[in-house]
Amino acid sequence: MVPLSEYATVDEDATLSEALDVLEKAQEQFDKTRYRHRAILVCEKKTGKVIGKISQLDVIRSLEPKYDLFMEEKAFPQTGMSHFGFSPKFMKNILDQYQLWYEPLHDICGKAGKQNVKDVMHKPTAGEYVKEDANLGEAVHQLIMGHHQSLLVTKKEDIVGILRLTDVFKEICIDRRKANQPSAGQK
């Protein structure tokens, strides 16, 4: 778990451009022995409480607002359209029909940077929170079942950190290595 105090955060009134600056700075300053941040937590201005998060995918998706026309979560509450496994031909048809990514990337990025993070952020669902005292198996189950890249860790009602899939994977690799080492009595 990465403590909340060590994670990239922005106020809800920040622009997407400001949020990306914070993420870049956090990546530069983060301990080089660990994985870099891949998301930004959005905090309520008055209370400082986490109200959302912005992943790298959220940022990229926000560059092309036309995705909202057919990937709206209201139409597909669990996953949007992203998990249906469409054919390459169908995907290309959508790209052309909605004229996605037709403008130069430089122009798209310039417009998107002015967006407010409240309009881009993902509001975590109940399945994206895990209690601080939950065992690793429970957290792994939530990550797998929800296809989540991270979970917000809570202590009572407060968010105290973020448990990232990359950290869980690293721990699994360490434990696998230990499990495959011969014990002291074996040779």
Feature names for model-found ranges:
Residues 23, 34-57, 143-146, 151-166:
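A glycine-centered beta-loop-beta connector
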Residues 8-11, 51, 128, 160:
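Short amphipathic alpha-helical molecular recognition features
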Residues 1-4, 14, 21, 53-56, ...:
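Non-catalytic interaction/Regulatory regions outside core domains
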Residues 1-6, 56-128, 140, 144, ...:
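Tandem CBS (Bateman) regulatory domains
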Residues 26-28, 45, 103-106, 116, ...:
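Residue-level detector of functional hotspots within protein domains
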Residues 10-37, 63-64, 129-147, 172, ...:
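The conserved cystathionine-beta-synthase
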